[in-house]
Amino acid sequence: MESSDQSKSELAREPEPDGTLLESSLGYRFRNPALLALALSALKQPLTPETAAARQRLEFLGDAAWNFAVALAVFRTQPQASPGDLTRFRAAWSSRTGLAQLAGRIGLPIPASPSPRGPSQRVLAELLESVLGAMVEDGGFEA
C-alpha cells in the first residue's frame, strides 16, 4: 500500500456494516478490516482521488493474484491440456463475465447504478478484484 498520510487515513476507516457477512462468504477474516472497507469503497460515490487510486491498486493486486491462482489451478487439474487450452480455461475464469458471476455467487454488495439493469460486469469484476487484492495485502497469497 501507499505510505502517504492520505492513504493511511483512508485505511483507518471503519469497515462496511456488511463486512462480517462478506468475510463469512469469502471464508476469510481480515486482520485489518480497513482493507476490506477500502476495497468496498467503490460502493460509495464520490470517491476522493486518493481513495480511488488506493482502491485501484488493490484491484491491480487482486487481478494479478486471481490470474495466477486460476493459472495454477488449471495447470494442476488439466494435465493433458495444451498450452492453448490452458489459456482458454484461464481466460474464461478471468473474464469480466466470469468475475461478475463469481461476485454475485459469493454475495459481494452490489454498487448503486443509474442503469435499471444494475452495475455493469466491469464494475462487478473490478469490485471483486479489489476485494481479492485486499485479501492478499492483508494475509499474503495464502489468503
Across the structure, where does each feature detected by a protein language model lie?
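RNase III-family endoribonuclease catalytic core
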Residues: 2-143
